[in-house]
């Protein structure tokens, strides 16, 4: 957790490697913004769904007919908001995996990597996993927050995408205090369950990443992430949080 006003940081194994799961879509989005800054891609460019880029798992685009065209802007929203795997494949195919890999050091990523095998949605182990760390994910969010990811207009666009409300608030977003706002991305794959977020609060903003792995129960992992979020809610909201928090019934 990093306080974005004071820079004060609380860490627990921040450099441990975890399968990135769908958190990898955040640096993919940043790479796409670099491609646009370099004049090689546009938010208005339209890409077509085909059998080659249709991917199962998360997202609704897999149900769209072949030939359906969507703007890059919309694909990025689907990729983050629905964690849509088809949108992700379409964006990756347009940029090229090699280009995206080259941007990771440019973004400031030393341990986070992306590989073709790592993009697989299968549940078992893969030859080359996409790994990340809590420190690097939090660093990316801080750069976006401060307008330092690619450039200020790109950071503002990405922040708005991350702020879009998900269908059902969960993990770090569950039980968000009134008047707060969250920009976040979740991940869930190969026994990994994550959430990485920026919280906007009346008492100061902060970034927080929780990575969990080797989970036997995704439900328990999600509950743990939510409990950790609530500890920070109490810290930043103080007595106000306890006053509005739902009380448990006594038995």
Predicted regions and their residues:
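A short, well-structured edge-of-sheet supersecondary motif
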Residues: 1-14, 200
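Structured C-terminal helix/loop/strand segments within mature extracytoplasmic catalytic/sensor domains
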Residues: 94-96, 139-170, 181, 185-251
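Acidic helix-start/capping segments at beta-turn-to-alpha-helix junctions
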Residues: 2-4, 43-60, 95-96, 161, ...
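Mid-domain, small-residue-enriched loop/turn segments at the edges of structured enzyme/sensor domains
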Residues: 89-149
């Amino acid at each position: 957790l990093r306080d974005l006003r004071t820079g004060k940081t609380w860490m627990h194994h921040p450099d441990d490697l975890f399968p990135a799961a769908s958190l990898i879509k955040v640096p993919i989005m940043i790479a796409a913004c670099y491609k646009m800054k370099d004049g090689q891609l546009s938010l208005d460019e339209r890409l077509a769904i085909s059998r080659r880029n249709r991917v199962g798992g998360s997202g609704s685009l897999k149900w769209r007919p072949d030939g359906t065209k969507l703007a890059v802007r919309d694909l990025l929203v689907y990729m983050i908001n629905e964690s849509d795997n088809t949108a992700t494949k379409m964006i990756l195919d347009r940029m090229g995996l090699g280009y995206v890999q080259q941007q990771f050091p440019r973004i400031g990523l030393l341990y986070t990597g992306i590989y073709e095998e790592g993009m697989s949605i299968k549940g078992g182990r893969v030859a080359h996993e996409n790994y990340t760390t809590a420190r690097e994910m939090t660093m990316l969010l801080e750069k976006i927050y401060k307008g330092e990811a690619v450039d200020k207009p790109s950071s503002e666009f990405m922040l708005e995408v991350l702020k879009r409300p998900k269908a059902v608030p969960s993990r770090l977003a569950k039980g968000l205090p009134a008047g707060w706002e969250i920009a976040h991305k979740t991940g869930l794959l190969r026994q990994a369950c994550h959430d990485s977020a920026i919280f906007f609060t009346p008492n100061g903003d902060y970034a927080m990443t929780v990575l969990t792995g080797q989970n036997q129960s995704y439900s328990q992992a999600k509950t743990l992430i939510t409990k950790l979020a609530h500890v920070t809610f109490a810290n930043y909201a103080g007595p106000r949080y306890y006053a509005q928090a739902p009380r448990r019934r006594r038995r």
